[in-house]
Amino acid sequence: MKIIEQCETQHAEFQYVPRMLDIIESRISSDEIVGVPLITVKEIKLYGLNAFLKRSFDLISSSLLIVLLSPLFLVIAVLIKLDSKGGVFFRQKRIGQGGKEFFLYKFRSMIDGAEGLINKIADKNEADGPIFKIKEDPRITGAGKFLRRFSLDELPQIFNVFTGRMSMVGPRPPLPTEVKKYNEWHWKRLRVSVGITGLWQVSGRSQLPFDEMIKLDIFYIENWSLWLDIKILLKTIPVVISSKGAY
């Protein structure tokens, strides 16, 4: 207030740049009643009819993709079995909407028992925040490198979408160990169903700092529309083909 008053005495206009979190709180609008200024925080859009529309879109799209991609699933399964020992699929506990645990499925892209070796390479982590990422992860198999380059290892998550555990578009499902390190505001990203792809995945993928990923997730939640989901899915295609930021 003192700064504003000083500007007024100097006949200068006062302007300021809010924090990034203030900017993405796009549900905030200003109004006034009988001259009294009010700030309104609008409800998140993903409930009721909108939630029904999103789930319907997920169910239809995942059903079609399962049928259309079945031949590709078979080819990938054979490739994995020929390349290294272990199962075709890899399942991992993740945290979904509301903090609920579920099993996420992927095509196996690492050697069998890779999770047990994570402590040996923990000091090589290249990501900030609670996420663990290494560009040249020694646990990745030959076939796994190809699958990860084009995000083909993520395809079994379509079954997670079909069963209602995930959505086609939404925040990335975190590991339980990641959630333990969350700050309070990070939990906002788990107010909706987690997804296969999302806003930050088409805005830089693994190259983005952790907090920027979270901010993009929150922006998505607060500005959701079915058209936004479709746009993100369409933008995911060239991002996957270019393999930009994938590792």
Predicted features, each with a name:
Residues 1, 47-54, 137-144, 176, ...:
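Alpha-helical membrane and juxtamembrane elements of multi-pass inner-membrane transport
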Residues 1-70:
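N-terminal hydrophobic signal-anchor/signal peptide
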Residues 18-22, 28-31, 89-138, 197-215:
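Short, glycine-rich, amphipathic interfacial segments at transmembrane boundaries or analogous
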Residues 26-27, 114, 178, 185:
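Short Asp/Glu-rich motifs
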Residues 50-117, 146, 160, 226, ...:
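A hydrophobic, helix-centered structural microdomain
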Residues 130-193, 232-240:
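A short, structured surface patch at a secondary-structure boundary
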Residues 218-221:
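Acyl-group handling in specialized metabolite and lipid biosynthesis
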